[in-house]
Regions:
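Coiled-coil termination/hinge junctions
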Residues: 49-114, 207-210
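Mid-to-C-terminal oligomerization/interaction "stalk" domains of large proteins
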Residues: 19-38, 45, 114-210
Length: 210
């Protein structure tokens, strides 16, 4: 650097030694700052990952509880297929086509103001609709989405009904509940990755600069 250059020109070895020492100190200070920044980053990542692991574990437990509750309540036909026992308020029929048409009417006309409004139930799980304001191609419109609620709000097709098929519309909530195991598996897979990543971050976060 410039200090070493000037020391060499002067022929003063004391100045040269001092310049080298200053350079070494500056280098060590840079290393120290870099180390502590890296450790702080690792500590933050570790905290985030530990929270994520805890949240995922809680979700798995809550969804497993819902799934077991659904299995205990669900009725099946002679072939073992789960029956669609959805009930919609104001509809006396158990016919899926009739129920589906009523659900499609709700999808077209509901205005809940952003609140989840109960409209029926399936095996004791409340079925609800929510009206959300959204933009499409620059225009605002009301998007009615449907959920079946346990410890979490479960959806099928992102909460949108099949508007061309009443029977498919009526089966939306059964489909949503039957997706629970695959959702649980997704959370378990995430946790497997986190359980490998967390010890590595713990090791980095516990290092001491020396």
């Amino acid at each position: 650097n410039f200090s070493e250059y000037m020391a060499l020109l002067s022929g003063n070895t004391d100045l040269l030694d001092k310049a080298k020492l200053e350079k070494r100190i500056a280098s060590l200070e840079g290393e120290r700052k870099s180390f502590h920044k890296g450790r702080r980053d690792s500590e933050f990542k570790l905290e985030t990952k530990v929270k994520e692991l805890g949240g995922n574990t809680a979700a798995i437990e809550a969804m497993t509880e819902d799934w077991n509750r659904f299995l205990a309540a669900a009725r099946t036909d002679k072939d073992g297929n789960r029956l669609n026992a959805v009930r919609v308020d104001g509809v006396d029929s158990t016919d899926e086509k009739v129920i589906g048409k009523r659900l499609q009417e709700i999808a077209r006309n509901a205005t809940t103001g952003g609140l989840y409004k109960p409209i029926g139930e399936l095996y004791g799980f409340p079925v609800k609709v929510v009206s959300e304001r959204t933009l499409k191609e620059g225009l605002e419109f009301t998007d009615n989405r449907f959920v079946v609620e346990g410890n979490y709000k479960y959806t099928y097709n992102n909460g949108h009904l099949a508007m061309a098929d009443p029977v498919a519309a009526a089966r939306n909530f059964l489909n949503a509940l039957e997706k629970i195991p695959s959702t649980i598996d997704q959370y378990k897979a995430k946790n497997e990755g986190l359980e490998k990543e967390i010890p590595q971050l713990q090791e980095i976060a516990s290092k001491v600069w020396k």
